[in-house]
A protein has these predicted regions:
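A generic structural signal for short hydrophobic patches within well-formed alpha-helices
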Residues: 10-11, 41, 118-119
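Active-site neighborhoods of divalent-metal-dependent phosphate/nucleic-acid chemistry enzymes
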Residues: 69-112
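Acidic, PIN/NYN-like endoribonuclease modules and their adjacent C-terminal/linker elements
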Residues: 26, 101-128
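Short, well-structured N-terminal submotif of metal-dependent ribonuclease cores
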Residues: 1-36, 47-60
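Histidine- and aromatic-rich ligand-binding microenvironments
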Residues: 5-6, 36-37, 93-94, 115-116
């Protein structure tokens, strides 16, 4: 199975929380492949700055466990449409979440997250 791990999932994994155990267990199955959308790296860097964490160490962990998905112009355009549609249902649905959802639909994979915006969406493993 292919999974997109979002920023929230990575952070829970890094702090070793109970929620993060879900991602850790998925890493153990060699059949699973993991992706990280590059815009999530900016969110993780922001978290590192706020929490005084070593981003260089964490990005090495991310890169050793997942492939980084580059974003191109048309991805942003598609994400803007996805954000518009999601905002009809969730008023605070953001552009980064829309980008992750856009890539999930494009690649027909699953998202791993504990972000409330993904809770009731299909193809999401929600980390409770």
């Amino acid at each position: 199975m292919i999974y997109i791990a979002d920023s929230y999932a990575w952070i829970e994994y890094f702090i070793g929380s109970k929620k993060g155990e879900i991602l850790k267990k998925l890493f153990l199955d060699e059949k699973n492949k993991f992706l990280t959308v590059e815009c999530c790296l900016a969110e993780i860097k922001g978290w590192c700055l706020r929490e005084n964490q070593d981003f260089e160490k964490l990005i090495k962990i991310i890169k050793s466990n997942s492939n980084i998905l580059s974003i191109i112009e048309y991805d942003w355009i598609d994400a803007a449409k996805e954000k518009f549609e999601q905002r009809k249902l969730q008023k605070t649905f953001g552009l980064i979440d829309a980008m992750i959802l856009t890539k999930q639909k494009e690649l027909n994979c699953k998202i791993i997250s504990c972000d409330k915006h993904f809770k009731n969406l299909s193809s999401v493993i929600f980390m409770d």
